[in-house]
Regions:
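Flexible, D/E/H-enriched segments
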Residues: 1-48, 59-156, 187-326
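Beta-strand elements within well-structured catalytic alpha/beta cores of enzymes
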Residues: 48-54, 143, 170-180
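Aromatic/hydrophobic pocket-lining residues that form π-stacking "cages" and hydrophobic walls in ligand
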Residues: 100, 161, 330
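Short gly/pro-enriched beta-turn/loop segments at secondary-structure junctions
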Residues: 135-138, 167-171, 176-178, 268
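Non-transmembrane, aqueous-exposed alpha-helical and coiled segments at domain scale
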Residues: 159-166
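A structural signal for small-residue-enriched, beta-sheet-centric alpha/beta enzyme cores
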Residues: 180-186
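Conserved small/polar residues in nucleotide/adenosyl-binding loops
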Residues: 327-337
Length: 337
């Protein structure tokens, strides 16, 4: 059996517009065309496994992995139900799901498989598999995004997945179903009026895409907390998919990236990005965080705050030097409070 590997990675948007209404907005059509191009790339690579990390499947009790060999249902989006419904019938690799579950627990993670009739597949996974694997030719696996998982836990989740990919000799494609900026309009808008929610969101999105196109995936992961504070709705789920995707690619900055499309979906930043593991040979890296192999502790209530916070700048007193004595400005002190 050949050594398994991740042959490609993709970032894809989560909302149903690209499936149900691509022609209502030129930007949605561009995203749909980018999905189609990504699907062709996956087919050309002869991948034999699609791995979906979806931000629209939140979990609290550990990491959940879809293990129903053929989940069938009809998905209606909670917000955009007016667009219609998406029937689905997916080809899930249950053997890989169970092996990943075992590997998670071997590395200290809380993990379980899900397999019962009627369990709803989230919108991000439905959109990704419907458009990237339209004929169900390639088996897939879907993992939840644990709401409280910090960088350490998310990195270990990826490494346990890599354990199974290598053990089974798979040609895998890693896919994060996510938005860039996720601030959305809170009222109805006409499709023709869709745009990124704010200029600030757009500027940050473009900087993220610049890094990804340069193959600097780990740099994006290292900036995850800053990105979350700047352009993400402040909730428990952080900008953690980049932690997972970077770890799936060996925490590298010398990848080959290509942005296939970037457009707004009801104000959120939607992008289709292809990340090729081929090295550009120019990616320097200066990491601020440790590499981890095992998860050794439970999530605490302070973890989320720790993940959001950056160290405060230290105040350094001026160096002593041969100079004049300090001057007391008494006329200014009178105004101090």
């Amino acid at each position: 059996m050949s050594q398994g590997e991740v042959v490609a990675s993709f970032v894809v948007p989560v909302h149903p517009h690209t499936v149900l209404a691509p022609d209502q907005n030129p930007g949605w059509r561009k995203l749909r065309d980018a999905f189609d191009e990504a699907a062709q790339t996956i087919q050309d690579l002869e991948a034999d496994l699609l791995i979906i990390y979806s931000t629209t499947w939140p979990s609290i009790i550990g990491h959940q992995i879809q293990a129903d060999p053929n989940p069938e249902w009809v998905m209606v989006d909670h917000d955009f139900h007016d667009l219609g419904s998406i029937p689905y019938s997916f080809n899930i690799d249950a053997d890989f799901a169970h092996a990943w579950d075992d590997a998670n627990r071997n590395r200290g993670l809380q993990s379980r498989c899900v397999n019962y009739k009627g369990f709803p597949i989230d919108v991000g996974s439905v959109v990704a598999l419907t458009l990237l694997n339209p004929d169900n030719r390639i088996p897939a696996v879907i993992v939840s995004s644990n709401m409280y998982a910090n960088r350490t836990e998310t990195t270990v989740l990826a490494k346990s997945c890599l354990d199974v990919i290598q053990a089974q000799g798979r040609k895998a494609v890693a896919i994060t179903a996510m938005s860039l900026s996720n601030r959305m309009f809170t009222d109805f808008i006409e499709a023709k009026d869709d745009k990124i929610h704010s200029l600030k969101d757009d500027e940050w999105n473009r900087k993220i895409l610049e890094f990804l196109e340069q193959g600097r995936l780990e740099d994006v992961g290292q900036l995850s907390r800053t990105i979350h504070r700047q352009i993400r709705v402040q909730k428990v789920v952080a900008f953690k998919p980049m932690w997972w995707l970077s770890a799936m690619n060996g925490n590298r900055n010398d990848l080959t990236g290509r942005v296939l499309a970037y457009e707004a979906i009801h104000g959120a930043g939607g992008a289709v990005v292809h990340i090729d593991p081929t090295s550009t040979g120019i990616g320097d890296k200066e990491y601020d965080e440790d590499d981890v192999e095992y998860f050794h502790g439970e999530r605490g209530v302070l973890d989320a705050d720790d993940e959001q916070a950056e160290p405060a700048p230290q105040s350094t007193p001026p160096a002593e030097a041969n100079g004049p004595e300090p001057v007391s400005y008494t006329h200014l002190r009178a105004h101090e409070t």
